[in-house]
Amino acid sequence: VLKKLPGVDVDENGQVKYKGKAIDHYFVEGMDVTGGRYNQINNNLSAKAVKSAEIMENYQSVKALKGKINSDEVALNLKLDPKARDQWITNGTLGTGWSDNNDKLLWEAGLNALQLGKGKQSVYNYKTNNNGKDLSNEQTRLTGNNQQQVPLSGFLSQPGISAPLDKNRLLFNETHTLNGNRMYKWNDDRSLRLQAGYTHDIIQQQRGNTQIYYQPT
């Protein structure tokens, strides 16, 4: 649905851009239930549930400044089909396999539930895998207006591996990510949003280097 909009692109991480610029706000029925972490919606909401998508240029997020100060912010608002609005939408996935190279069981599973209306919304999501699929963007704020997100510093930094392969071929992980979002909106001036998220990510990495020297005979 989004890719069909003129000027809209969606990159490999799920970030929505309009005319090359990341959107600053992502709304569903005028509400931002995920606080900019809209992959939790995009990855789980069926296209059939979306009635229309609207791009709003020069969107002013500060109500007191509307009509007084110009803004270069861009907002996206999804309007749902009346049959899907306020209804609980649930999805579940489960897949398993066996890796002969590592002699281990591989899995990928997910369970999510969404309830998106005009006055209250909920998004709950759990995903896990150990097959190399990166789930880090599930908790990442993707909107361009992300000043409120404070980067966390880790105790250890993992070196990157450069190779002409897809990322899932290089990632040996065991990841569990869980998040919950609940929002109430009484009017344009009063709303309440509750959010919680947790990610447990174990990444293993092995590196090797072989050098071969040839000498003329």
Show the residue positions of the predicted features.
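Membrane-proximal, glycine/serine-rich, low-complexity loop/turn segments characteristic
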Residues: V1-T217
